[in-house]
Amino acid sequence: MSLKDRFDRFIDYFTEDEDSTVPYEKGNEPVFTPVNSSQEPDLPMNQPSQSAGAKDSNITRLHARQQELANQSQRSTDKVIIDVRYPRKYEDATEIVDLLAGNESILIDFQYMTEVQARRCLDYLDGACHVLAGNLKKVASTMYLLTPVNVIVNVEDIRLPDEEQNGEFGFDMKRNRVR
């Protein structure tokens, strides 16, 4: 395979397929398409493929959900409730994400998990947080605050002198390098 072929395949990977795009149409304007007698007439490009339509509807629903949560925060004057969770295994993370999807704030304390389990759980929660447009903030060495899009958290960065000595729960979203 030549370098040119590889380069062409690389470019083709990042270009969009014409079938999956929906052309912009102006209302009440006739569209004229010339048809050659030697070619068969193409199917109309107005119909997106099934997978593209499903993706667009999922994105639309996600944006609608984010707007709904933002509007609720502006008009609600109710008290805010923060759920406190002490996960003991990785499977508890799905319950925490369900609470976040229900527009609740969750304080998560990983003191009953091993460091490896807690990192794995944090990775899962961080991914769900990005999908649901939430916020994940570290508030203590083993505690994280997970909030929906309509809650703003301001955490003052305080370094306690004995916090650095206690390396037992010093896990964070960043990976430690093995030396």
UniProtKB/Swiss-Prot annotation:
Q: Where in the cell is it found?
A: Cytoplasm
This protein's major location comes to cytoplasm
User: Which Gene Ontology terms of cellular component type are present?
Assistant: cytoplasm
Record has NADP as a keyword: no
Q: Where is this region: Disordered?
A: 18-57
GO biological process terms, semicolon-separated: division septum assembly; FtsZ-dependent cytokinesis
List the keywords (alphabetical): Cell cycle, Cell division, Cytoplasm, Septation
Q: Which domain of life is it from?
A: Bacteria
Q: Which family does it belong to?
A: Belongs to the SepF family.
What assembly does the database describe for this protein?
A: Homodimer. Interacts with FtsZ.
What protein does this entry describe? Cell division protein SepF
Q: Species lineage, top-down? A: Bacteria, Bacillati, Bacillota, Bacilli, Lactobacillales
Encoding gene (name): sepF
